[in-house]
């Protein structure tokens, strides 16, 4: 089974629409990265219904730690930096997208995170 995980910073107090937009940015960018490095995972994920899970962290430090661990594992990923046109400061790190990849690989880096 394949999945994609999206990790959102909860401490920024973004509105629901803003969080949804940041999650979409993270999902698309991670997907594009996955197409380059893991086409078999992308195909599997597409054929299985494109499962996604959205998780939260409470600080930029936690988000960067997740991003570092994802890179150590060699998973396709994205780190989203907001342009700052609406609710938050320009350059704020808002989200990380992980995968698509096999669930067991993503589980290594998301194991302690709570659902958004």
Swiss-Prot record:
<dbReference type="InterPro" id="IPR002833">
    <property type="entry name" value="PTH2"/>
</dbReference>
<dbReference type="GO" id="GO:0005829">
    <property type="term" value="C:cytosol"/>
</dbReference>
<keyword id="KW-0963">Cytoplasm</keyword>
<dbReference type="Pfam" id="PF01981">
    <property type="entry name" value="PTH2"/>
</dbReference>
<dbReference type="InterPro" id="IPR034759">
    <property type="entry name" value="Pept_tRNA_hydro_arch"/>
</dbReference>
<dbReference type="GO" id="GO:0004045">
    <property type="term" value="F:peptidyl-tRNA hydrolase activity"/>
</dbReference>
<comment type="similarity">
    <text>Belongs to the PTH2 family.</text>
</comment>
<keyword id="KW-0378">Hydrolase</keyword>
<dbReference type="GO" id="GO:0006412">
    <property type="term" value="P:translation"/>
</dbReference>
<protein>
    <recommendedName>
        <fullName>Peptidyl-tRNA hydrolase</fullName>
        <ecNumber>3.1.1.29</ecNumber>
    </recommendedName>
</protein>
<comment type="function">
    <text>The natural substrate for this enzyme may be peptidyl-tRNAs which drop off the ribosome during protein synthesis.</text>
</comment>
<dbReference type="InterPro" id="IPR023476">
    <property type="entry name" value="Pep_tRNA_hydro_II_dom_sf"/>
</dbReference>
